[in-house]
Amino acid sequence: MIAWLDPQDPFPPVDEALGPDSEAPGLLAASRDLSPQRLLLAYRQGIFPWYSSGQPVLWWSTDPRMVLAPPALRVSLNLRKTLRRVLRDADWEIRVDDDFLAVMRACATTPRDGQDGTWITDDIIAAYGTLHRNGMAHSVESWYRGERVGGLYGVALGRMFFGESMFAHRTDASKIALAALCAFLGNHGVAMIDCQQETDHLASLGARPIPRAEFVAHVRAATALPAISPWRFDKSVLERWAGTPAAPAG
């Protein structure tokens, strides 16, 4: 059994989440409350929401937890070549928070292999939109010739980033945004990006699973640090991966 949370209820301890032999490993609690306050309380404890339309809000704390250290991003030869083009070509732009809600909607509507529908419901978009307006959620976007072709979004608390979803409408466009995010976060002393659940795709990008207890301890320490401000991106931060100077602006 899992806990049902009324709006005033705290989360149960994360070690009470369902175990690996259950039908839903990592499931901790359920509620109808998806307020920004509930979301912030969840993230600071290593908990995230994931549910389908028509279900109550389901809260998870998986063990192990998939994380990506920004310096560990695995840049393939093809992606490295793409990043060099991005740096040299003024047709390519990396924008931060150009249109956060548009990125969320693109993540919700972009078809994915093996996935029917989306967990990014209207309620999710509204709740994370509020976090964004309060400076606690951000998007990183790949633009080509004035068109948004890829991007990602997540929650930023202190020196911790919780990745939520990404999309690509052009080859490697989401990976370009991820490389930009890793470069930006690395420059600001962020040691870990939360990737939530273990998948082969995330592993191919350099993410790795760590014990939940280790993850939660890191989250508590990192979210207590000062927040990154402002969120501004310059192409030159990608030079650490691509090794090619960015073209001058103008």
Swiss-Prot record:
Q: What class of enzyme is it?
A: transferase
Keywords (alphabetical) are:
Acyltransferase, Cytoplasm, Transferase
Q: Does the keyword Magnesium apply?
A: no
Principal location listed in the UniProt entry: cytoplasm
Annotated localization: Cytoplasm
Q: What GO cellular component entries does it have?
A: cytoplasm
Work out whether the entry's keyword set contains Transferase: yes
Q: Which Pfam families match?
A: Leu_Phe_trans (PF03588)
Catalysed transformations (reactions): N-terminal L-lysyl-[protein] + L-leucyl-tRNA(Leu) = N-terminal L-leucyl-L-lysyl-[protein] + tRNA(Leu) + H(+); N-terminal L-arginyl-[protein] + L-leucyl-tRNA(Leu) = N-terminal L-leucyl-L-arginyl-[protein] + tRNA(Leu) + H(+); L-phenylalanyl-tRNA(Phe) + an N-terminal L-alpha-aminoacyl-[protein] = an N-terminal L-phenylalanyl-L-alpha-aminoacyl-[protein] + tRNA(Phe)
InterPro entries according to UniProt: Acyl_CoA_acyltransferase (IPR016181), Leu/Phe-tRNA_Trfase (IPR004616), Leu/Phe-tRNA_Trfase_C (IPR042203), Leu/Phe-tRNA_Trfase_N (IPR042221)
**Function, in words:** Functions in the N-end rule pathway of protein degradation where it conjugates Leu, Phe and, less efficiently, Met from aminoacyl-tRNAs to the N-termini of proteins containing an N-terminal arginine or lysine.
Family from the record: Belongs to the L/F-transferase family.
Protein name stated in the entry: Leucyl/phenylalanyl-tRNA--protein transferase
Q: Which organism is it from?
A: Cupriavidus necator (strain ATCC 17699 / DSM 428 / KCTC 22496 / NCIMB 10442 / H16 / Stanier 337)
Identify the gene encoding this protein: aat
